[in-house]
């Protein structure tokens, strides 16, 4: 799981609290598979932190990491929950099922999202970004007054259910492939942002 280290009281930053709570939960409730929590910096200047981390993984580590779950914007009271899947389409269906099972409205699409998950997909690790759109995220209006505990809880619940479902699966249900309809936009994205 990954997220960016941002200012601490805004939709851009509360993902850190969600990651900490997930970390605490899985410390007390271990999964069948190991789970790694990663905080990355410099997302806003070209995903520099996550790109460095992903590119510095050893070949053995790359083989062991089967999925990256990235949490981006979260907590806006008025907003929509989204998942962008940089992996095979079956992960879209898993997310739709888990969201429906948990009573969480979720828009799911396969593709790329300009967030840390793209750095992991770029090195061949399937990835998904969970985020919530709403007013003010990543702007000068990005303040704590936009946050609400119920909206934060939805992102936490979805990340928890997805991690538990996949982390405890007898056979991991998502293949290690990055499909071409994801790979090409990913290559285009990194070509456009190179040197920025």
What are the language-model segments listed below?
Residues 30-31, 61, 125, 148:
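Residue-level recognition of short, well-ordered coil/turn positions
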Residues 40-135, 140:
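Metal-dependent peptidase/peptidase-like ectodomains
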Residues 13-17, 44-48, 89, 114, ...:
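Soluble non-cytosolic domains of exported or imported proteins
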Residues 7-8, 49, 74-75, 169, ...:
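Glycine-centered flexibility motif
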Residues 3-12, 78-86, 105, 144-146:
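Second-shell loop/turn segments in exported
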Residues 17-20, 24-27, 33-35, 136-196:
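His/Asp/Glu-rich mid-to-C-terminal helical/loop segments that flank catalytic regions of hydrolases
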Residues 9, 18, 68, 96, ...:
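Generic detector of bulky aromatic hydrophobic side chains
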Residues 1-47, 159:
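Alpha-helical metal-binding/catalytic segments enriched in His/Glu/Asp
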């Amino acid at each position: 799981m990954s997220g960016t280290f941002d200012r601490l009281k805004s939709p851009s930053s509360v993902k850190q609290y969600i990651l900490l709570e997930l970390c605490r939960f899985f410390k007390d409730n271990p999964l069948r598979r190991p789970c790694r929590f990663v905080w990355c910096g410099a997302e806003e200047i070209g995903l520099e932190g996550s790109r460095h981390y992903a590119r510095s993984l050893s070949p053995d580590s790359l083989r062991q990491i089967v999925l990256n779950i990235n949490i981006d914007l979260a907590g806006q009271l008025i907003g929509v929950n989204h998942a962008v899947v940089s992996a095979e389409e079956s992960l879209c269906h898993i997310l739709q099922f888990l969201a429906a099972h948990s009573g969480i409205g979720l828009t799911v699409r396969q593709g790329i999202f300009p967030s840390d998950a793209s750095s992991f997909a770029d090195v061949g690790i399937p990835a998904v970004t969970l985020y919530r759109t709403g007013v003010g995220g990543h702007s000068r209006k990005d303040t704590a007054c936009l946050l609400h505990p119920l909206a934060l809880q939805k992102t936490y619940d979805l990340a928890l259910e997805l991690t538990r479902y996949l982390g405890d699966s007898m056979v991991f249900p998502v293949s290690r492939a990055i499909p071409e309809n994801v790979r090409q936009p990913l290559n285009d994205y990194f070509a456009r942002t190179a040197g920025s």
